[in-house]
A protein has these predicted regions:
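Class I S-adenosyl-L-methionine-dependent methyltransferase catalytic core
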Residues: 1-127
Length: 127
């Protein structure tokens, strides 16, 4: 929602939980952003084909289950990522994020018990 408040054209929200999707849709209506929000009950490791690549991806999967590399690969394969896409991946503070050579880590910030990794596709892996 922050991205929408700062001028993003559209935001996709995916979650495996129906309750979370309902909450997202309710919040979108409350913020008068319903026409710019697409909230879908989807496993992010199995995304649909993108209508076009996006500029920003925020990943907040369950911690310490290895979902981030799998999700990054899936998003790339399905056209969500391009060479300038910025990915912010949330992990547990002490969780080590292991990426393949298709991704470069730009920065990492620790906030409390949370780690935020800022990633971009490498030129070799860019779609």
């Amino acid at each position: 929602f922050e991205a929408l408040s700062r001028g993003a054209e559209r935001a996709w929200f995916w979650d495996r939980s129906a309750a979370c999707i309902t909450t997202i849709r309710d919040n979108a209506r409350h913020l008068n952003a319903g026409d710019r929000v697409i909230a879908q009950r989807i496993d992010a490791t199995k995304p649909p084909t993108a209508p076009r690549p996006v500029d920003l991806v925020f990943l907040d999967p369950p911690y310490e289950q290895g979902f981030i590399p799998t999700t990054l690969d899936a998003l790339t394969r399905h056209g969500w990522v391009r060479d300038l896409t910025l990915v912010v991946a949330e992990t547990k503070r002490r969780e080590q994020l292991v990426l393949n050579t298709d991704w470069i880590s730009l920065d990492r910030r620790d906030i409390g018990d949370t780690g935020l990794s800022f990633l971009r596709p490498s030129m070799a892996g860019a779609a």
